[in-house]
A protein has these predicted regions:
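Positively charged n-region of N-terminal signal peptides that target proteins for export
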Residues: 1-4
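N-terminal, intrinsically disordered, polar/charged segments of Gram-positive cell-envelope systems
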Residues: 6, 22-73
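Hydrophobic helical h-region of N-terminal Sec-dependent signal peptides
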Residues: 6-14
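C-terminal motif of bacterial Sec signal peptides marking the signal peptidase cleavage site
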Residues: 16-19
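Short, hydrophobic/aromatic-rich segments at coil-to-beta transitions
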Residues: 54-61, 84-88, 147-157
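Secretory pathway targeting signatures of secreted, lumenal, and periplasmic proteins
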Residues: 69-118
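Signature of long, low-cysteine stretches enriched in small and polar/charged residues
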Residues: 125-171
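Surface-exposed amphipathic alpha-helical segments
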Residues: 177-207
Length: 207
């Protein structure tokens, strides 16, 4: 599903850029949601160094220098979509709870590096939101804003007809790259994994 959504985003943005439209697009709704909230509201102080160390041992750092890194439970395993694709994806052993990392590149949008540097992140997130709104897989789609790895992100939230949640962060990191991070799963899993992803994302591997 992620491969098709990312591909749809690339196609939509390419068409948008080809039209030479510079109209500002706003695809975010800053109202609070039960699915997505900023990391600052999710994080809590460690009760002891022992508890912190125990939690550290229960997680692993996944990702790459190209796509960035996040923490996930140590029990999660890497998998590859049957349709192919270059995403980095980990799951809990089911096809329900999944985290995906990727980075948008200039060539995907058929634009120059100079144009990529000026590309508005809102445009990218708007395209993702639109592709989900047009998909028959989702019963509800909305936008919000949050923070991931210290960066302001435009977040696209969706609820699948199966009841599964999908949260997608789109943001530009300090190296100029436009990042894509998504988390999908059931509500209970997201309560734990969402703040973990938001607080741990980094473009370098931090042990």
């Amino acid at each position: 599903m992620k491969k098709l959504l990312i591909l749809g985003t690339v196609v939509t943005i390419s068409a948008f850029l080809a039209s030479c439209s510079n109209k500002s697009q706003t695809a975010t709704d800053e109202s609070s949601s039960t699915v997505v909230s900023s990391s600052s509201s999710q994080e809590t102080n460690s009760t002891s160094s022992a508890v912190s160390e125990a939690k550290k041992q229960e997680t692993q750092i996944i990702g790459s220098n190209e796509y960035g890194f996040v923490k996930v439970p140590k029990s999660w395993v890497r998998f590859h979509e049957v349709e192919g694709g270059n995403d980095i994806q980990y799951c809990d052993g089911t096809d329900i709870n999944i985290v995906t990392l990727n980075t948008f590149k200039a060539e995907q949008f058929n634009i120059s590096e100079e144009e990529y540097a000026k590309l508005d992140v809102v445009t990218v997130s708007s395209s993702i939101l639109t592709s989900k709104e047009q998909s028959s897989d989702f019963s509800k789609v909305w936008g919000s804003k949050s923070t991931i790895g210290g960066y302001e992100a435009y977040v696209v939230n969706a609820i699948a007809k199966s009841g599964k949640y999908l949260v997608t962060w789109v943001f530009r990191s300090n190296d100029g790259k436009i990042r894509y991070v998504s988390l999908e799963g059931d509500g209970e899993t997201l309560k734990t994994i969402l703040p973990m992803v938001e607080s741990s994302w980094s473009n370098t591997k931090v042990e």
